[in-house]
């Protein structure tokens, strides 16, 4: 470490100075060879050197040149004296201590004289004898390959309430020359333990080279200590021992002393049973509640170079969760080769002639290079040193779900001779003590705290291979996102890493299992489940087929994400916080989950990844979806491990050309916004803000899945184009909601397996992603069984049942694992909003890189297309979300997800019972029953109106905004204009970013300076108001501005101007509604039909006028007066809800384009005038250049002050108050093929006219008198007498749907009797309407039409008083 004292806030990269973030080589000369430190103890006799003096940086080996991951760390004072960067909050017994282990910048083969390095985590100086932890190697000596032992907050039983002091890198702390008494005692403990653990089995079971111990640092607020397996809250802290035993069989014996030095607890060696190795040395099962022992003798030079332990950034550090990098992962390990069994304390199972997998490789990111090499000392290092993983853990403090405050770990059935307190970890028994509850920071709250941990681990920091592990035990959030390397070193002897979440069932790796382990039953993973209470026997997990290379022997442990596991670490698969993922490592049942979790607020760490992940955890203690979808397919091996919350993505380095594959799966327990920049190589630190508490959002995958796959497509040779090695497995198990439906997979309950891989879920939202033929997804290199047994089906009670957006992934019917991974969003039609491009548009070449995090409830601000907020659940059973291509271009409609349906049914069950009881209370009374039926019809029609609006509006209710930057993305689909209105010419166009939708390019005819001020009304989207999706000035060919009539030849084929064409700057408006004609065209073309079928035509005119009134009423509600209502400004668009986005999986196609299946036919149809005339067209009000907005509608304070000085007549805009009504009266004449009366009779404008002065309309149908009366009412010369647009709408409704004159022409009827009659009529019409909808619902040939929607609007709001007033206006009374 450099002695640099310049501290800057920057991004630290491995090999960089932690103070100034420059290269370490800039300050520090590289020593030629590691030398024995002055105060280092002799091997086997001396205490391990003080961490301050253990300078891994001085080892004299240049660091590897690889793209170093960036870790965002707080600018904290780093000690310059120690390369191991100890951050000591305090070594006193009261305060836990944080270790900042610094990654050695050099990788070297340690010399014999190097002593093991022991990292002491926070411990509270309470002494406790530790049960033996076996150095699983057969050698009795563990070489000193930089054994790094991290002991995390081992709290003293005496001081429970001591709040953890914030980590401070003060020089006085790091520079202290004298060890505190606690430190001294710990050194004695280490010496004692070194003697204990030095006995590593030889040869056949070599200890792997020291894996950098990635233990999480306790957060500042990590006052609450984890539940340790020891009952007295000290044992079983998250201690991890990095075993550094050379692969050579003649490992030099390290410190042998096993006595309790200085009264410190000395680990006791315990015989664990006969070994299958030649060296029948005892297996040392050490449960170090408080001591972490550094193993490794300096005498024997290990082959394995010391690996660079990654510095856990403070934000990412978890006090208990031990993030460990293991060399067994198929991904490039950050550590040197031959790191087989990284932690002696972890389970290491001797396999005859084969290397044993270390169960508990939390992140096995390195290839299993040492498997055969360990067994064969002559074998050379085959795996280049891999970059270290990056771990980021974030915990948030939350109250545990009510439950027993001190749950006891379940007894595991163990062979005779092993006490109940001992826990079998693979082949090592570890002393297991009852978990102790650590107090809250204040210590005031004795109730257990449940912590939510998010662990972000970029296991492969190098450019081509990155894995991000996101895990949260509490909120059931776990994501591992591996990016397979483009060029992985596929070694013939290397085994594809098998990622076992906590254990591989003993049948999985029979060749790796010792006799001892074969007899043991797997235990529950540390991810605790309420469903398996303490004391209940643990049933063995169903065996999962091991597809790892049989030749390499030990199953390679794939990258395994271990978030803060419950304190019952030693008893759980995670030995000392390390997930034991050994071949058949069995983990005893952990302590119950909800009580033992870390309770810290979420902290986000960027693991050197150019992708950005945000997890919004849900702080919820209620039931959570306990399904775990982590599917481990390292060579098709499915090892379901401890926690249902673990989501494991295993990038596998296929040996001998194996394709590295990973499963992709997602579970909803948190909102994920994966924003991936298009430049993968660009390293950027991203620290998302903490999510709002109690917030649940839909899976915000704003970036298209192309980004997901781009993240994972780094493995060029092995993964399919669409999903190269990207496996996003989000399992949804939550530690505090596993009560009734999920036991951890390692619990082995045969009834179900929480680790359901989303790829095998029955209901897939996305189509399978094909992998190349060479894929060995389900075929092990050794020819092992291809598929694990089908997962048993279980019934899930989702925590998302209360999710407002109903977005959760529920577990589908279990199926055998499919060969090709699918990005499966579960079975519910998740509310995935299309944004900027389809949410999972997994086309590899998608150019869209803009990211916008949005929820399903918020408007699609910049999206190219929206989703229907209500879409009928798309076949909740097995809808594929409309994803039909391998590129997963799925536009998942925001549909009512199955969770929402179940939630509504569950939540409303009680209210429904009450409502039913109320409805049936007066069942004996016919009048009361009819009255209640009428109310039910009214409510149903109101709901139908809303659903019809969603059906007809489709995805257009979401607002879109295009700017000039998108102009080049649009391409015309037809050379001819689709419509020529009064102010603009419309062309059909498609956007390259959204090829499935058709837009209208409106090129304004008015000069650019005048039309540049064009602004659409600032009103919400309405069915009858033209929606401005963006307007800007653009250069267009002059030929495009020519009228279709005058343009005899095709215009430019595209919007881009042709070189010879003369360009003109015009205002271009992008709209969703593609008109096919104006009302003027409609009137001109329908003269013959009006004469032939006057009633049909005039009824259609009534519908057009009704839509006009609806639009004008919407504008007036927002204080806007159009002032330019003419036939040319009224556009007609085709409306066909059957192909609208509501019921379909592609909700973004505008309804106006439903007239044809594809863009080109749509444009052609538009140019030719559209389909048959039977369908009612959609009327759209356009051209707001003359529109006025009433004063007072602004929110600008200055404008409000100015308007406060206006005269009343100006403020009231009395001259414009009923301006649109008057123009609507004129339109009635023009629509009925009559001239404007004020053009024919100019004298009407010069004097006050009366109704009789207006020209009469010809009576051709039963609608003619009503239209004549309505025109007179709208053309009243006195604005006060002129009816409002709302009244005109109700008059039109009466004309269209009644009541008829016969109903009200009863002599001598009072108004009260007439009102009762009208009330009964409304009830009858509502019942008939409900019947009509019911019949159309089951008739596929018939669909809901625009007329039905308009009628629903009328009947839903009709009431006798308004009907009576309308009848009077029509002079029907």
Swiss-Prot record:
Residues 31-50, 197-235, 250-338, 376-448, 468-794, 804-823, 1041-1062, 1138-1171 are annotated as: Disordered. GO terms for biological process: cell migration; negative regulation of neuron projection development; positive regulation of Rho protein signal transduction; regulation of cell motility; regulation of cell shape; regulation of Notch signaling pathway. The modification Phosphoserine is found at residues 671, 720, 757, 802. Disruption phenotype: Deficient mice shown complete embryonic lethality. It comes from Mus musculus. Residues 945-1296 form the Protein kinase domain. Residues 250-263, 272-284, 506-522 have a biased composition (Basic and acidic residues). Residues 419-438, 568-578, 655-670, 711-721, 729-740, 1041-1050 have a biased composition (Polar residues). The keyword Lipid metabolism does not apply. Residues 911-954, 1298-1373 are annotated as: Required for homodimerization. SMART domains: S_TKc. Catalytically inactive protein kinase that acts as a scaffold protein. Functions as an effector of the small GTPase RND2, which stimulates RhoA activity and inhibits NGF-induced neurite outgrowth. Promotes Src family kinase (SFK) signaling by regulating the subcellular localization of CSK, a negative regulator of these kinases, leading to the regulation of cell morphology and motility by a CSK-dependent mechanism. Acts as a critical coactivator of Notch signaling. GO terms for cellular component: cytoplasm; focal adhesion; nucleus. This is Inactive tyrosine-protein kinase PRAG1. It is found in: Cytoplasm; Nucleus; Cell junction, Focal adhesion. It holds the Pfam family Pkinase. Homodimer. Dimerization leads to the catalytic activation of CSK. Interacts (via C-terminus) with RND2. Interacts with CSK (via SH2 domain) in a Tyr-391 phosphorylation-dependent manner; this interaction potentiates kinase activity of CSK. Interacts with NOTCH1 intracellular domain (N1ICD). Forms a complex with PRAG1, N1ICD and MAML1, in a MAML1-dependent manner.
């Amino acid at each position: 470490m450099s002695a640099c004292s310049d501290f800057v806030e920057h991004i630290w990269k491995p090999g960089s100075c932690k103070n100034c973030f420059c290269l370490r080589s800039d300050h520090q000369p590289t020593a030629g060879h590691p030398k024995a430190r002055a105060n280092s103890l002799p091997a086997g006799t001396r205490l391990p050197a003080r961490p301050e003096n253990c300078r891994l940086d001085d080892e004299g080996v240049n660091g590897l040149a690889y793209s170093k991951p960036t870790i965002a760390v707080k600018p904290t004072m780093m000690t310059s004296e120690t390369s191991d960067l100890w951050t000591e909050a305090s070594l006193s017994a009261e305060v836990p201590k944080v270790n900042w282990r610094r990654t050695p910048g050099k990788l070297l083969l340690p010399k014999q004289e190097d002593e093991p390095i022991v990292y002491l985590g926070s411990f509270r100086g309470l002494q406790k004898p530790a049960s033996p932890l076996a150095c699983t190697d057969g050698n009795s000596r563990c070489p000193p390959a930089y054994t790094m032992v991290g002991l995390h907050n081992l709290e003293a039983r005496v001081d429970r309430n001591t709040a953890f002091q914030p980590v401070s890198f003060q020089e006085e702390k790091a520079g202290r020359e004298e060890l505190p008494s606690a430190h001294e005692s710990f050194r004695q403990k280490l010496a004692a333990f070194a003697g204990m653990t030095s006995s590593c089995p030889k040869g056949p079971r070599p200890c792997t080279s020291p894996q950098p111990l990635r233990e999480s640092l306790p957060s500042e607020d990590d006052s609450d200590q984890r539940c340790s397996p020891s009952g007295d809250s000290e044992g079983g802290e998250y201690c991890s021992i990095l075993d550094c035993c050379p692969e050579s069989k003649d490992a030099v014996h390290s410190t042998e002393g096993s006595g309790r030095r200085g009264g410190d607890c000395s680990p006791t060696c315990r015989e664990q049973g006969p070994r299958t190795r030649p060296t029948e040395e005892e297996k040392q099962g050490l449960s170090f509640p408080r001591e972490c022992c550094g193993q490794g003798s300096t005498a024997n030079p290990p082959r394995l170079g010391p690996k660079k332990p990654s510095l856990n950034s403070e934000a990412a550090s978890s006090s208990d969760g031990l993030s460990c990098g293991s060399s067994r992962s198929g991904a490039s390990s950050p550590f040197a080769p031959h790191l087989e069994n990284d932690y002696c304390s972890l389970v290491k199972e001797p396999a005859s002639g084969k290397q044993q997998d270390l169960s508990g490789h939390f992140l096995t990111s390195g290839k299993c290079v040492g498997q055969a090499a360990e067994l064969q000392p002559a074998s050379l290092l085959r795996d280049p040193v891999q970059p270290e993983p990056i771990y980021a853990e974030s915990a948030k403090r939350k109250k545990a779900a009510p439950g027993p405050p001190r749950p006891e770990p379940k007894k595991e059935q163990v062979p005779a001779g092993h006490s109940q307190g001992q826990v079998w970890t693979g082949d090592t028994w570890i002393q297991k003590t009852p978990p102790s509850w650590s107090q809250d920071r204040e210590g005031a709250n004795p109730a257990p705290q449940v912590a939510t941990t998010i662990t972000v681990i970029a296991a492969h920091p190098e450019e081509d291979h990155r894995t991000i592990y996101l895990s949260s035990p509490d909120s059931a959030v776990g994501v591992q996102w591996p990016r397979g390397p483009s060029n992985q070193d596929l070694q013939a002897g290397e085994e594809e890493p098998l990622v076992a979440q906590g254990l591989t069932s003993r049948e999985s790796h029979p060749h790796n299992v010792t006799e001892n382990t074969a007899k043991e039953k797997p235990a529950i993973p540390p991810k605790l489940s309420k469903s398996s209470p303490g004391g209940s026997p643990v049933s063995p997990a169903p065996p999962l087929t091991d597809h790892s290379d049989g030749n390499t022997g030990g199953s390679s442990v794939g990258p395994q994400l271990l978030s803060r596991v419950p304190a019952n670490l030693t008893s759980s698969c995670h030995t000392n916080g390390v997930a034991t993922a050994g071949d058949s490592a069995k983990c005893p049942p952990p302590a119950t989950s909800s009580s033992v979790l870390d309770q810290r607020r979420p902290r986000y760490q960027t693991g050197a990844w150019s992708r950005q992940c945000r997890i919004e955890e849900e702080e919820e203690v209620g039931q959570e979806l306990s399904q775990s979808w982590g599917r481990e397919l390292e060579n098709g091996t499915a090892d379901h491990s401890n926690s249902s919350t673990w989501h494991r993505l295993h990038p596998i380095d296929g040996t001998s050309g194996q394709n590295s594959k990973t499963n992709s799966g997602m579970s909803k327990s948190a909102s994920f916004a994966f924003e991936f920049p298009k430049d993968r190589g660009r390293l950027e630190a991203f620290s998302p803000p903490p999510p709002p508490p109690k917030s649940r959002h839909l899976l915000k995958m704003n970036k298209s899945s192309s980004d997901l796959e781009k993240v994972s497509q780094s493995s060029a040779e092995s993964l399919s184009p669409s999903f190269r090695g990207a496996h996003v497995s989000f399992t949804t198990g939550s530690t505090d909601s596993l009560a009734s439906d999920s036991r951890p997979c390692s619990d082995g309950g045969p009834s179900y397996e929480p680790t359901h891989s989303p790829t095998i879920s029955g209901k897939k939202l996305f189509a399978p992603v094909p992998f190349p033929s060479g894929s060995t997804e389900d075929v092990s290199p050794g020819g092992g069984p291809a598929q694990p047994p089908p997962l048993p089906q279980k019934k899930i009670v989702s925590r998302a049942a209360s999710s407002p957006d109903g977005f959760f992934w529920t577990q589908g019917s279990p199926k055998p694992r499919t060969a090709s991974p699918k990005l499966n969003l579960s079975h519910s039609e998740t509310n995935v909003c299309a944004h900027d491009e389809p949410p999972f548009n997994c086309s590899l070449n998608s150019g869209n890189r803009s990211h916008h995090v949005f929820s399903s409830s918020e408007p699609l601000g910049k999206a190219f297309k929206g989703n229907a907020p209500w879409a009928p659940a798309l076949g909740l059973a097995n809808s594929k979300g409309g994803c039909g291509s391998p590129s997963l271009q799925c536009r998942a409609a925001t549909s009512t997800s199955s969770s929402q349906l179940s939630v509504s049914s569950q939540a409303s069950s009680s209210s429904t019972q009450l409502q039913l009881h109320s409805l049936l209370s007066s069942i004996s009374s016919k009048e009361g029953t009819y009255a209640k039926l009428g109310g039910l019809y009214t409510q149903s029609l109101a709901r139908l109106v809303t659903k019809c609006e969603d059906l007809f509006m489709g995805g257009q209710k979401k607002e879109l905004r295009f700017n000039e930057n998108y102009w080049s993305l649009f391409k015309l689909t037809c050379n001819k204009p689709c419509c020529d209105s009064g102010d603009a010419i419309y062309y059909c166009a498609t956007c390259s970013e959204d090829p499935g939708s058709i837009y209208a390019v409106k090129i304004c005819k008015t000069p650019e300076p005048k039309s540049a001020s064009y602004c659409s009304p600032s009103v919400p989207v309405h069915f009858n108001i033209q929606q401005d999706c963006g307007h800007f000035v653009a250069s267009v060919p002059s030929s495009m501005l020519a009228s279709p009539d005058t343009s005899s030849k095709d215009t430019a084929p595209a919007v881009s101007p042709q070189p010879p064409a003369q360009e003109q700057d015009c205002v271009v408006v992008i709209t969703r509604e593609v008109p096919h004609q104006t009302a003027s065209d409609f009137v001109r073309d329908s003269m013959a039909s009006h004469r032939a079928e006057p009633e049909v035509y005039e009824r259609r005119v009534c519908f057009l006028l009704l839509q006009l009134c609806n639009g004008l009423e919407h504008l007036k509600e927002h204080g806007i007066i159009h002032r330019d209502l003419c036939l040319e400004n009224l556009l007609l668009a085709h409306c066909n809800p059957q192909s609208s986005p509501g019921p379909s999986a592609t909700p973004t196609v505008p309804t106006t384009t439903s007239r044809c299946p594809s863009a080109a036919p749509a444009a052609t149809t538009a140019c030719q005038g559209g389909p048959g005339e039977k369908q009612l067209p959609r009327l759209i009000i356009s051209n707001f250049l003359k529109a006025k907005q009433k004063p007072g509608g602004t929110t600008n304070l200055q404008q409000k002050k100015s308007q406060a000085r206006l005269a009343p007549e100006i403020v009231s805009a009395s001259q414009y108050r009923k301006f649109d009504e008057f123009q609507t009266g004129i339109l009635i004449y023009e629509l009925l093929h009559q001239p404007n009366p004020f053009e024919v009779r100019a004298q009407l404008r010069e004097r006050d006219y009366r109704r009789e002065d207006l020209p009469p309309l010809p009576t051709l149908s039963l609608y003619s008198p009503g239209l004549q009366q309505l025109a007179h009412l709208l053309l009243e010369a006195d604005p006060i007498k002129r009816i409002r647009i709302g009244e005109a709408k109700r008059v039109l409704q009466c004309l269209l749907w009644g009541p008829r004159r016969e109903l009200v022409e009863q002599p001598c009827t009072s108004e009260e009797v007439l009102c009762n009659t009208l009330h009964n009529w409304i009830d009858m019409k509502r019942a008939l309407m409900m019947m009509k909808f019911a019949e159309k619902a089951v008739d596929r040939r018939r669909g809901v039409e625009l007329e039905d929607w308009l009628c629903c609007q009328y009947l839903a709001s009709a009431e006798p008083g308004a009907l009576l007033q309308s009848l009077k206006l029509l002079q029907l009374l």
